[in-house]
Amino acid sequence: MILNSIKSLIKKIFPFTNNIRYDNQTVKIMEIVLEPDSTFIDVGCHKGEVLDQAIKFSPNGRHFGYEPIPHLFSDLVNKYDNKCQIKNFALSDSIGESEFHHVVSNPAYSGIKKRSYPGNENVNKIKIKTTTLDYELINESRVDLIKIDVEGGEYGVLKGGKNIINKFHPVFIFEHGLGASDYYDTNPSDLYDFFESLDYNIYTLKGFINQSTVLTKEKFVDLYLRNKEYYFLSVFKA
């Protein structure tokens, strides 16, 4: 009984400490990548914690936040007023409507598809609107950094943005983890091949900060399958 309780506690603490590490690394990367007039895109904006940092590092830039959950969207609109463009969409590879699993008890786990959850969660199905990165951003003058945190739907987001990727070559910080992306019938080889076809390299967040070697396909797949890392960075090879 005691051993089971300890194991349960470790399972809860491990992702929490990892998330703190990823948050700190994300801020460091934003400090490296963003210029005062950079354009930042927050896909899965949630409460705007990352968007806050974009405003700090790029006070003269244009910033976009995408959040499909109605009450979070309303909170973001009130929070940012005219500082950012906040949009009530989920990003995908198509424009239209979709069923969306709103995890009421833990909104950060919400997504178009129901994924595995660490506990018993209260999930409501709602209808949301979808759009694509290409449709939203193709007429912008620059796009510098895109953060994607959509609980497994990241490959769809990327496929909907091939034109803006080729035009702007933005840096990507993206979540890609076992227990989420596999519910979208996506595997790490798909993402690696996608980025490779566009002349992008993939790093761990720490690897990019420390200017380490790029991830090979085998290493990227291995980190995913062993759940050793679930946040990554991709950057154009130029």
Regions of interest found by a model, annotated:
Residues 1-238:
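Phosphate/nucleotide-binding beta-alpha loop and adjacent structural elements of enzyme active sites
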